């Protein structure tokens, strides 16, 4: 019988088939990615989170009484002060820094809004009270009806997400904005944790890309914990520059996410105020020579305070005020709008420190609060 095919010919045909299959797979993946990007853009453009706010009527400070978590006392089983946000607002009002009627009320993020970043599978998983209990680290939540978990826990979180997204728009218009909430920096597109159920930082930046024509963002994450959520989300996005100063001895110890940090400052438990501020000053000066931001996202966790049970650092209240002032001066020097998120902070004293810091920013003319602030310029 005649030899029709040589082994060389067979191998050549096999190679062509493999290449062809690979090309089809790449083309299919590319097509899916393009479709996802189109859907993302459509969702952002259709969103109602970017409400119009008159500067004559409101200051760029975002807050809602819906931010606070309170149901059956279960929230007290987590060290986080679940009413911290209302305490900050009350202190600012009582101190004459901010009139309640001039605070901006955000819109709650809808499922379509959240799908800009999150997967369907992840959002569906939040219909399980057990999953939410794992994310919030409050075990009894697992035994509650999910409608109650949605109402009393996830609704406040979604409201804060709306506040973070809106803050970017306000900052673009006014130069700065503060969300008295948000900063859920442990959550990424497909996973929550550390009391963070939604990736508000990632969402705010994605909205800023599309709606604000912003293409260079710096995240300055000064919460005591590593911001592994946004680090994972922006793994392949060099439009975002990340500075993260965190206690490397504590949660989450996400070594894979650490590779995404542009300027990582791994602190040790017990780091004191002077050392902390010196390191921050050094990193801000370095960043100023490397990256020119069009938006600064400042995650201003107060779990760095001495006595915080989870942060384990030894920064004084005055040190937090100086820290916040340094970051706002950095943004001012860079001529970049800035948003501040209150993020973590697990002591009852955190709210007072945050309010005092905002009051200091107003006194130093780093923010303008004509509704009630006063103080000498520096």
Which residues are covered by each model-predicted region?
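Short, functionally important structural connectors and interaction interfaces within domains
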Residues: 72, 95, 106-109, 118, ...
């Amino acid at each position: 019988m005649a030899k029709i095919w040589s082994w060389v010919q067979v191998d050549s045909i096999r190679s062509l088939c493999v290449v062809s299959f690979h090309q089809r797979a790449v083309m299919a993946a590319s097509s899916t990615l393009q479709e996802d990007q189109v859907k993302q853009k459509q969702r952002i453009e259709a969103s109602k989170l970017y409400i119009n706010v008159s500067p004559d009527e409101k200051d760029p400070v975002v807050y809602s009484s819906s931010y606070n978590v309170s149901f059956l006392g279960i929230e007290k089983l987590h060290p986080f002060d679940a009413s911290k946000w209302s305490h900050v607002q009350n202190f600012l009002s009582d101190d004459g820094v901010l009139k309640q009627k001039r605070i901006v009320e955000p819109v709650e993020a809808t499922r379509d809004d959240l799908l800009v970043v999150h997967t369907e599978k992840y959002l569906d998983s939040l219909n399980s009270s057990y999953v939410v209990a794992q994310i919030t680290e409050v075990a009894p939540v697992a035994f509650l009806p999910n409608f109650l978990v949605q109402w009393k826990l996830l609704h406040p979180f979604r409201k804060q997400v709306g506040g973070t997204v809106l803050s970017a728009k306000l900052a673009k218009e006014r130069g700065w904005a503060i969300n008295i909430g948000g900063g859920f920096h442990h959550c990424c597109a497909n996973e929550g944790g550390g009391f963070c159920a939604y990736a508000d930082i990632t969402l705010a930046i994605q909205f800023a890309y599309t709606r604000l024509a912003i293409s260079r963002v710096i995240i300055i994450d000064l919460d005591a914990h590593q911001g592994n959520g946004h680090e994972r989300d922006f793994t392949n996005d060099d439009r975002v520059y990340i500075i993260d100063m965190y206690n490397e001895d504590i949660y989450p110890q996400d070594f894979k996410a650490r590779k995404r940090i542009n300027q990582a400052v791994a602190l040790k438990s017990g780091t004191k105020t002077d050392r902390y501020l010196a390191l921050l000053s050094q990193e801000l000066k370095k960043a100023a020579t490397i990256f020119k931001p069009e938006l600064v996202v400042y995650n201003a966790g107060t779990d760095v305070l001495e006595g915080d049970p989870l942060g384990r650092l030894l920064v004084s209240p005055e040190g937090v005020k100086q820290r916040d002032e340094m970051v706002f001066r950095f943004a001012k020097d860079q001529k970049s709008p800035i948003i501040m998120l209150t993020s973590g902070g697990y002591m009852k004293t955190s709210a007072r420190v945050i309010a005092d810091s905002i009051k200091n920013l107003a006194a130093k003319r780093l923010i303008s609060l004509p509704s009630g602030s006063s103080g000498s310029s520096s």
